[in-house]
């Protein structure tokens, strides 16, 4: 029953933001409360770009779940959201663009039913 649009931010891809917001909704956590501190996200971004040579610093869904798991060890609010992962099973998600294989696979592993528009996020010939 929820319709929400998500766009990429400087820290997260749109799929990652949608995933965190779905967990917040399930856990009844106020939208203004961050589940993952930028102090956790930013070093991961630096690792992705500087050490691993990625061009996109934004966290994919699998990376944001790892960051959430780390946050959950010290933050009770993050822990509560993390415990909601099982509740995502059989939920439906729709993207207005074709997701990366990483994000699509993460939703599949979480048993989220995903549909996508027939449009790529970028104009690159290959889409990972």
Model-derived regions: residue spans:
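Active-site proximal loops enriched in glycine and acidic residues that flank catalytic Cys/His/Asp
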Residues: 7-8, 97
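Generic alpha-helical structural element
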Residues: 8-11, 74
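A short, polar/charged loop-to-alpha-helix boundary motif
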Residues: 10-27
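Short, small-residue-biased leader/transition segments that mark boundaries at the very start
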Residues: 2-5
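C-terminal binding/interaction regions
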Residues: 31-128
